[in-house]
Amino acid sequence: DPIRERFVMSTKTYLGKRGSILKETAQQANLISLDSPILSGASYDALTKGKSLKNKSVVIKTSFKKIDSSIEEALEIICENIKKEIIENKKSVIILSDRDVRIDESVLPSLMVLAKVHHYLIDEGIRLKASLVVVSGEIRDSHDLACHIAYGASAVWPYLALEKVRQLSLQNQELELTPDKAQENYRKSLNKGL
């Protein structure tokens, strides 16, 4: 019953290191609060470039060179890099991104990477030390979004879909819809679908 669910469900999410739900600590108040798990370009920039947040986050590429390694090896390298960032560099927001892929690289499917990283961190006993954010061109609709959240993502940035929405708003001037408003409408529809 999606009409009544909105009164008892929330899309609010938190990023950062989590503590025990049984013991209240100051660390639990040090989380980044988001009204929606769907990031905009501005909120992504705040996570990666903002003065107070960039020390908490790190971007991990989800692409690899097929010449250098297999899919399994690439996944292991990603997991080990993330473990190092969490333990040694105290990063609490891990951003898995396929955005800056080069021509000689292949992109790993975002759900595969997310599932592998999520379970690797659980096995290592450090899953609650960081939130996972996925930046992917694969996310297009509310089903894709729901799958990513179910696989362990705290937030996503569907940059390619948002860019397409922006382009469509510019190409269809008769709609009288600014690119920002079109992207906001798209994010609202994803939230509603979620």
Regions found by a protein language model. Name each.
Residues K116-L194:
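Phosphate/diphosphate-binding loops
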